[in-house]
Amino acid sequence: MAFQKENFIKFILMVFALSSLFFLFLIFAFILIEGLPLFLKVGLKNIIFGFKWAPTKGSFGIFPMIVSSFLVTFGALVVGGPMGLSCAVYLSEYSGKKMKMLLKPALELLAGIPSVVYGFLGVIYIVPLVRNYLGGSGFSLIATSIILGVMILPTIISISFDALMSVPKSFREGSLAMGATKWQTIYKVVIPSAKSGIMAGFILGMGRAIGETMAVIMIAGNALKIPTSILDPLRTLTGNIALELAYATGDHRLGLFSTGVVLLVIIMILNYMANFGIKKKRLK
Amino acid sequence: MNQMTEKLYILFLFIGIFTVSCGRETSDRKDNQSPITIAGSTSVMPFTEKLAEYFMLDNPDYVIDVQGGGSTAGVQACINRTVDIGMSSRRLKDDEKSLRDITICNDGIAIVVHPGNPLNNLTIDQIRGIFNGRIKNWKELGWIDRKIDAVSREEGSGTRGSFEDLIMNKMEIDDGIMVQDSNGSVKEVVATDPYAMGYISLGLVDERVRGLSVDGVAPTTENIKDGSYKIERPFLFLINGTPDENTQSFIDFVLSKEGQIILKKEGLIDIL
């Protein structure tokens, strides 16, 4: 009796576990079915390396958006990377229990704030700041990078923190016993040993930044051109889909799905890289 | 003990599922009226909502469901018969002519700037130049040496479509122009950025943004009505085939004097 129930529960749990895989498969299939026909019709090169996006007039080039997506992602890393890593190092190496108890929930809260709130704050505060002190319209690469940098902090911190914590204590003790100071130990021993995990955190942060939509639409300005300065507006892949989907029909709609395919491939590569990093760490 | 709690959980789960599914069935059926569904242009939507509110006040047993989605989506939904009425803020294209369009009112498109902007008038050619990327600096229009932060709408938008038809004259809107995805967002950008310029529905112009005269004609309801302000477009209701009784009575209400007065109060141009 008990055994049967055990099995029954196991089966139910397995069904739910597999359903997540099933949804992933559905999403893949759906995006590919909708997105691929246009690649066949217009040509891969004309979409990925095309400079002109005028879907109602038959141009589907999304190269500027690919570049813009990577630019904001890189910008977010420049803003959020050092901050996140410092926070993780502080948390794992220096902070006492009390500080940890304060910082950890705060970070979880930061992760839970909806992106539209970030976007709203960006429009109200960051954009005017950029406009008044740096110039341009304020809807810009730099404003977007700052907001995204803050948004990816929780991801970077929590994964880097785990990586730093998993460095064995004996490494630190060995280094200290050799006469190294605490900072030398962190800099020369702990961070290098946790390198692949920290990289994984950065890459997952990149994935979050490249996939962010709502906040980006609100502060990026969404101009189609490749930005030539950090004060220029830009449009990301996700922004393009969300901006135009409501009105799109026919080929225009397919074009947006093609944008989705490209985005999916980029995210897949990033996740693969992150997993690779984590695995390498475990093998060590 | 453990088994008891487990059983309780399962019981609660079933009760939960049961009540939810029951709730669905009963709550949607207030009466025998099926709701009138309307979808389409986000420019027309707020006004349709207002009209629906007034209509339901007088006829409490009608249910009107108004959704956005954009002009093109409205046309599509109407062709597929997923809605009773489609809304569009642009004229129908040739392949969409199977639908019947009813002009419920006209709307001007105002070229708006920040209230602190000293300019009052632009020519159509200047506006075209700005959005075409030929004129980039306010200095060229006789103001300070500062880049113009022009804001357009996204591809497929009815307002953008009308703007292209009425102003751009087959010229393309430049890639460097910013894009926002609703009248509201464009207005927000223009209201907060002193160097911005955009175009929005005239009905939405208030003290936070200022509408510019075009070729010397101010964007007012009177000037649109007598035809001197040229940048105007119709707000359309679209129907596929013969509408049912409920739908027809709502359309009649919108076209009646009462409905038109409501639209006029909202800053639109009535068709009386």
Language model features by range: what are they?
Chain B
Residues C22-T72, Q76-T82, G86-L272:
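Exported/periplasmic ABC-transporter solute-binding proteins
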Residues N2-I10:
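Bacterial N-terminal signal peptides that target proteins for export
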Residues Y9-T19:
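Bacterial N-terminal signal peptides
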